[in-house]
Each structure stands twice: as structure tokens, then as C-alpha cells.
Amino acid sequence: MLILTLPTLGFSTALSLVTTYLPLILERFTSSATLIGFAIGGEGIFSSLIPLWVGVMSDRIWTRRWGRRQPFMIFAAPFMAASLMLAPFQPGYLPIAISTFVFFAAYHFYTSPYQSLLPDVTPAASHGRVMGFQTFMRGGGMFMGMVVAGILFYRWEPLPFILCSILIMVFTYLTVLKIHEPEPELSRLPRREGILSELRRIWQSTRQNKGIQRFLVANFLWESTLAGLRPFIMLYFIYSLGATAQVGALLLGLVGVTYMVAGLASGFLADRYGRMRVMRVGLWVYLGGCLFGVLITDIKWAFVFLPLFGLGGSIVLTLPYAILIRLMPKEHIGQFTGMFSMTRGFANIIAPVVAGAAIDFGGRFLHGGRQYSVIWLLAGLMVAVSLYFFRGAGKDEVVRV
């Protein structure tokens, strides 16, 4: 599982690095926050367009040497690494923005087939644990891309970008070298069709799977909770709870540690007791954490409720793909994995705007910084609605070996 999930550490580090420190370089070439936001927020556009297409393509091919998912990883990794390495050396806003867009395109070209690789090469009884390991690696990547990279960035700005590029290539090489995809049955490979026929087939296969439809709606809501909180969480700490930026960073670090440990544990528990059952518990804990965030007014209480939120959030963001694996037809794993990734992309585009509008609306009734607590009410509402859609996603199964 370590070798299989290593690429997650690489691309998670890269994404955190780009979204955290590249804006500091862009700021030298433009004073427009809108332009900086466009360069970094463009990720949502690529995550809405590429995953489904590349996921379907990875379902339709087979190579004897590299399988069907790994060719996409091999192709995209050099583009991801090169754009990352060259970005801090670019002479102006436009070249940096282009490098960023190349990175985001390669990132989603890489990650959707890679995600589809996980169920291809692991037994059904281990899917929860694999997702737990992946969550742990994703949390480690966030730590490396935000904390470790910050130390390196202030020594020599290009250094974290160069080292992260090397990590991506090394981790991809190790995974491709050590992980061998099983050859699919010829009858399971979808026929190659034209674009219109392919779109019609995707629509029909999605329409036939009511459980997947409901689950994808629920996943969009879960991803939206995080996407809506992320841009405003520090403002909530500072203006609603009266914390300093340093205390806010400490709280986020506490959430990060909880996220990594709980993600690893929830994967093991899901395989033992059932993914749906553990997910339901996580959703109620997550909902409780969100409602607690609305009510508190003292920063001291944040040290209690944020680990609770991190615990529930880790479960809610770790297990969805492990549950989806059980719902997906084997011949369309790439397609539905792509759609799963698209829900995250749509959430990253829509949720921050909705959260910002909710804060502005709340400002009419709440004052003294309390309007930022509305983000927790919105997140709690989305979790509550998701419980309805999740209920129709199917029955639980515990696969034992």
C-alpha cells in the first residue's frame, strides 16, 4: 500500500505548494487579486473538464507493458513536474499563469486514472484501508506543501518547486515499476465509439445507476463543505473568535494531525465494520462539529470543536471513493471515477461563491465579525441534506477474507 499511495504524497504536496506559495510570486507582477485568483482558481475549470474524458479513455485502452491507467500517469508526470519546476523562474504574470494551467491540466490528467488504478490492483476487502493510507498521504502532502515548503521557500524560492518536481517523477517511477495492473477481460473493455455515441453511452450508464447518481450528489455536498470553509476559515478565527493568525495556524495544524490519524483509522474500521456504517457515524460527528462552530464565541472552545470537526471530516473525505468502488460497474470504473473527481471540481467552483454570498447576507443581521460563523451553518446544512441522498446510495457490505 505504501508504494501504491506514494503518488498521492507527490501530487498533494505539489497542489498545496502551488496554491499556497505561487500567489506570493504572482503578487510581484500584478496587484489585482482577481488576476491572482484566476491563475490559481483555474484549477476548478480543469477539474470539471478533464477527469471524465480521461477516465473514459483509461477504461477503453489496454497496453501489455503499462496496463490501461499507468500510460496516463507516465505521460502526465513530466508535464506536471516541468511546469512546477519552471513556474518560479518565469519573468511575468502571463508565463506563470500558463505554467500553472499546464500544471493543473497535467494534474487532472494524472490523478483520475491513478485513482481508478487503486481498485484495479487491490482486493475488495482492502479498499477502505487503501483509502485510509491515501488520506494519510494526502495529509502528509499538505503538511509538506505548506509547512516544509514554507521553510525552503524563504531560503530560496525555487527550491521547494524543484524538489517537489523530483518527488513526482520518483514516486511515479516507483509505482509504475512495482505495481502491475491485472489484464481486464476483453468483454469488459468498452467499445471505441465516436464522441456523440460516447456521450450518449455515458448518459445512459449514469441514468441506469440511481444509487451512483444519489451518491455523486452527496459527494458534491461533502466536498462543498470543505471548499466553502477553506477561503474564510482564517477570517472566522480572527474576526469571529478574536484569535491571532498564529493561533489560527496552530488550530489548522491540529486539524491536520487529526485528519491524518483519523483517515488512517477510518479505513481500517470501514473494512472491518462496513464502509456505510462508519460513514454514517462520521457524517453525524461532522454535522455536530459544524453546528458547534456556529455557536462558540471563544477561541478556547475551538481547541475542542475543531478536532471533532477534523475527525468527522476525515471520515467523510476518506471513505466516499471506497464506497463508490462497490457501486461502480467494473467496466466503467474510469468513467465514474472521472465523474467523482468532477464533483470535487464543481464544488471548488461553486461553494466558495455560495459561502461568500452567505457571509454577506449574514452581515445584515450579525455584526462584530460574527457573520463569518455563517460558514459553519452552511456547511452543517449541506451535511444534513447529504444524509438524505446518502441514504439511497445502497446497502452496506462487509467483505471478509
Regions found by a protein language model. Name each.
Residues S47, G128-F153, S341-P352:
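Glycine-rich segments within core transmembrane alpha-helices of 12-TM secondary carriers
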Residues R68-R69, I151-I166, A357-L381:
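A membrane-interface helix-boundary motif in multi-pass transporters
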Residues P182-V217:
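Juxtamembrane intracellular "pre-TM" segments in multi-pass secondary transporters
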Residues R69-M85, R277-F292:
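Structural signature of the two symmetry-related core transmembrane helices
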Residues T20-I36, P231-G248:
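Short amphipathic helix-loop junctions that connect adjacent transmembrane helices
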Residues P88, I168-I179, L377-V401:
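Multi-pass alpha-helical transporter architecture, strongest
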